[in-house]
Design a protein with these regions (language model features):
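Negatively charged
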Residues: 1-229
Length: 229
């Protein structure tokens, strides 16, 4: 089904499960999308926003999340805040694979808290081109992902990001970040790799940063853990 503009019918999936299921505290899986009466697009939903999509979905399993992701098409995301808190409610998920989503032509400005609190997440794939020159806020994006060991951001363009605050705060087991973090437009970065040594990325090595702001200092790392290129 398409409207007169030639676009498919779009669905705002902000807080989708929280708004459609009375009590999420014991829900472990979803058989069908709640209240989706249309059942069109061959079980595909074209989303306009994913803001808070998995909010409060603490017991959703890897399999449940993978199934939901496979049914969502993000080609027409129009909300510039579409990725705020998208996965932040997932507490037991150990793997996320977003390769079915193509981020290359999106212009999402705000990704604050996108994966915040995914404390059992060990493996994250399919985030190529997630952050681009239009992205402004990645505050707390991976904060408290305490099981995450490595991440590949080699295809990211962070040159337009203004807020890096607490981006990796609480990522105790993070060992490797593949790629370079460009802080050309940075205005805020407090606690980027930990508010202090106690919440810092103590196992991280070989971090590469370019264009740091004046007076650059990372509270959660020591200078042997990163280099300015």
């Amino acid at each position: 089904m398409e409207d007169k503009s030639g676009l498919p019918e779009l669905t705002d999936m902000s807080l989708w499960f929280k708004n459609n299921i009375k009590d999420l505290s014991k829900v472990t899986k979803i058989e069908e999308f709640p209240n989706d009466k249309r059942k069109v697009f061959d079980n595909t939903i074209y989303a306009s926003s994913l803001n808070g999509l998995f909010s409060d979905c603490k017991l959703f399993s890897n399999q449940t999340v993978d199934s939901i992701i496979s049914k969502i098409n993000i080609k027409y995301l129009s909300d510039k805040n579409a990725f705020i808190n998208t996965f932040s409610g997932l507490e037991i998920v150990t793997k996320l694979n977003l390769t079915v989503w193509d981020f290359s032509n999106l212009e999402i400005k705000n990704m604050k808290n996108m994966f915040y609190g995914c404390k059992n997440l060990k493996e994250l794939k399919g985030i190529k081109n997630l952050v681009n020159s239009k992205t402004v806020d990645i505050n707390t994006m991976f904060a408290d992902c305490s099981s995450l060991e490595e991440i590949d951001i080699s295809d990211w363009d962070t040159s337009g990001v203004e807020d890096f605050s607490r981006m990796f705060d609480g990522c105790f087991n993070l060992k490797k970040i593949t790629g370079v973090i460009d802080m050309k437009s940075c205005k805020q970065y407090a606690g980027m790799f930990g508010v202090n040594q106690g919440t810092g990325c103590k196992n991280l090595k070989g971090l590469k940063i370019k264009n740091p702001p004046n007076g650059f200092f990372l509270s959660g790392l020591d200078k042997t853990q990163y280099e300015i290129i």
